[in-house]
Amino acid sequence: MSTTTSYKVFSGTNSRYLAEKICNSLGCELGNMNITHFADGEFAVSFEESIRGSHVFLVQSTFPNSDNLMELLLMIDAAKRASAKSIIAVIPYFGWARQDRKDKPRVSIGAKLVADLLSVAGIDRLITMDLHADQIQGFFDIPVDHLYASTIFLPYVQAMNLKNLVIASPDVGGSKRASSYAKYLDCPLVLCNKTRERANVVATMQIIGDVEGKDVIIVDDMVDTAGTITKAADIMKEAGAASVRAIASHCVMSGPASERVEKSLLEEMLFTDSIPYNNACPKVKQLTVADMFAEAIRRVMNNQSISDQYLI
């Protein structure tokens, strides 16, 4: 890398697997830091090498629980107190992003709160991928580099060479994302219209469009309990689809998700490795985003544009 200022990459406990791959792509060593856990549940963070005057990249997805967010905040605080030149949070999966608006009375807006916490802690820039809502970028008063998993998904889909390809959105809210995929791949778009009984429980779903004899790929930003995406797959197969696959950026896969995917009529469930997945569901496959994040880090360090990486 041709830059006059040093940079260092560190990772919290949650994303070390991805940070190591990012460092391999960058040709650098993952920085050494220590996270000490205490009997009362608290933990402390310390850098085990000098970061004075360095650009510090901190890799940590804020999932599956709030400990990972707190760990990242402590990493940021420690870096600031250790005289880092700049602090860049690399958050492959930005948790709390579904709480992006006040959609009913007396509710919190978790995404805005997390943005404020990160900013107050001391980050100078955020690099993230496929936020649940694009407007979350506006919650920050610092630069946000928003990457898209479509950069790796679209070539994968093209290589499948499906002759009767149809792109589907599992709900109306994801129609913009699915429409971009359909336009790039030059194929039809199908929508699903769903109603919920309560959070994570889909009551009814209807297909808007023709899937008979088609190879359907459902596109979403994340899969949580997999209720929506597996119900959509089953309904599309019942409507005559030749095959149904799904791709989603973030492998949240909580609760009964793995069992639902395994029992569903999905042929394949494709994710990135923004979140580790250790359940041995044979239908689940992960593509790494390490090279994409490494390239973003290179370009940040060299003051180059990131947008020309995007396919859509």
What are these regions (language model features)?
Residues 1-312:
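PRPP-associated nucleotide enzymes
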